[in-house]
Amino acid sequence: MERDFPGQRIGPEPTTDRFVAVMNGKAEKVTPGNAAAMDSSRPFRALNRFGSGFLSKFEVSQCPSPILKDIYFVDTPGVLSGEKQRIGRSYDFAALIEWFATRADRILLLFDAHKLDISDEFRRSIEMLKGHDDKIRVVLNKSDRVSNQQLMRVYGAMMWSLGKVVRSPEVLRVYISSFWDKPYADVGASNKDLFDKERNDLLADLRSLPRNSAV
């Protein structure tokens, strides 16, 4: 998108428990979940069955962006770990992952290379993607923040962990890069050519999706 979207929150730990549908619009606007689920022009009316506990944690963010003319994104909450998983949700997180996965054309699993963590909640969420293996792409983000040797170890550990959860005969496609508009960190600068190619490959994959696809 090459820009932030309205209501975006970024941090080293999960900074939101909201599902955010990021869609194209002439002006920047955030629509609360209750209103979005009542709008017949949007594909979210079926979300009413998850109740107000979820709808209060769902919103539609609109902004002008060329890529959003063809697809829209659903940004899911950062996964929780430990005790936070048990008390931190007012809705069925895994059931919602399954609902969105059924309707999505592409599913991106994001991992940070400098902080690889597959919590129990993330593992259960991945298990809910069973039957959608062809839609899944893995993104190893912030790969420029680790050395070549560390990157190899992180990649191996990630694929080993995913192999225990994703029961697919096909090899998952993994994109290794740093997916924001900042310069690469010095420690990973030697992989610039690789990171550039991987970033372009991911964008090409998204652009190949049918018009009005969901990610």
Predicted features and spans:
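Canonical P-loop GTPase G-domain recognition
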Residues: M128-R137, K142-A214
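Amphipathic alpha-helical interface elements that mediate macromolecular binding in regulatory proteins
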Residues: D17-V20, I71-V74, Y91-E98, T102-D105, ...
